[in-house]
């Protein structure tokens, strides 16, 4: 079986059985089945996590870690491919099936290299298959399990397939690559009365939760424009719910969104600013509020020294000019040990045809991540596997 056939089998098998969050029994069983014949120690250091440790056999005391996320999304697949999801309402729409396939193929490479070419793998290797990247940050539970200390892991690498880059493009940068994120929920409390009773009532005595929410959203947008002039900062609120009927003042309003920044200083400034404009909006309408800032994910911040160490082995690596305002829980690993995260392009090159194979899978991604038609061809994963090989052969 060629490496492409191996990658295709893993990816399509896993694409058929998407599971969510920490509830991953079929996915875990599949990964354990692939790892079972390999000369590795398989452990479960925390709930719904699978780790595979390979002793390089050269007396190494340190290990290189490779991370793959396992969870899918609550999306009903609409691709029509022969290997589509068999779990209604669930889909691998973020490429985690590809991430797992690359890691599994890398594990078989390590096993073969240790057996057939002793000494070529100079460091021990730890593969980490983690749950809940899309939800609560499963990486954090892995870090807290002590698995890195147990196996002497002192560096970690990971990938994300990326439709915005041409297929096969390898991209990253030293320092911040992806943003810090924080879900923000606001509950505004007013008083619901019939609108007929509001005539002549001053705005500051209206207790109108919908009006307070509207004032907040306008002011918050102006705040972000000011903060964003200093460095990248986004605070967007995509959820607004208020009131129950059309002819009564809204007694309650719920506003929810996400804050994205790259530095702790800007995170603090943005949170303070949001609280200030919310204070002003509620004071102006006679309302009160409850505000919840989730801590969210830290920024993905690639270790500069490790980046400089690996860059000579990755001559095709494109350096990202500006960090991206998306978030990834790989960031938690980088709080525990040096790490580098890569983006792997899956998009169609400009002017390139996009044929489909016999199973209906296009050669290049045609849709964005988190959409019900997101697909890519496994040939792209060969690039990721090749990068993993080069990283694992480094001292």
Predicted segments, located by residue:
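Metal-dependent amide/peptide-bond hydrolase catalytic core
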Residues: 195-196, 200-203, 210-395
